[in-house]
Amino acid sequence: DAEFRHESGYEVHHQKLVFFAEDVGSNKGAIIGLMVGGVV
């Protein structure tokens, strides 16, 4: 259960980063999303 919740939480977090990058609609937003995603 713990592992499953971790995976599910990661997917949701990743989707939020992608949405943020798309919402910004700029290279800066995309780069920030990739940097944050890479750290996590």
Swiss-Prot record:
Assigned GO CC terms: clathrin-coated pit; early endosome; Golgi-associated vesicle; growth cone; perikaryon; plasma membrane; recycling endosome
Membrane topology: Single-pass type I membrane protein
UniProt entry tagged with the keyword Transferase: no
Keywords from the named record: Amyloid, Cell membrane, Cell projection, Coated pit, Cytoplasmic vesicle, Endosome, Membrane
Primary subcellular site in the record, as a coarse category: membrane
Any Pfam family hit: Beta-APP
Family as reported in the entry's similarity comment: Belongs to the APP family.
Record's function text: Functions as a cell surface receptor and performs physiological functions on the surface of neurons relevant to neurite growth, neuronal adhesion and axonogenesis. Interaction between APP molecules on neighboring cells promotes synaptogenesis. Involved in cell mobility and transcription regulation through protein-protein interactions. Can promote transcription activation through binding to APBB1-KAT5 and inhibit Notch signaling through interaction with Numb. Couples to apoptosis-inducing pathways such as those mediated by G(o) and JIP. Inhibits G(o)-alpha ATPase activity.
Subunit structure: Binds, via its C-terminus, to the PID domain of several cytoplasmic proteins, including APBB family members, the APBA family, MAPK8IP1, SHC1 and NUMB and DAB1. Binding to DAB1 inhibits its serine phosphorylation. Interacts (via NPXY motif) with DAB2 (via PID domain); the interaction is impaired by tyrosine phosphorylation of the NPXY motif. Also interacts with GPCR-like protein BPP, APPBP1, IB1, KNS2 (via its TPR domains), APPBP2 (via BaSS) and DDB1. In vitro, it binds MAPT via the MT-binding domains. Associates with microtubules in the presence of ATP and in a kinesin-dependent manner.
Name the UniProt record assigns to this protein: Amyloid-beta precursor protein
Name of the gene: APP
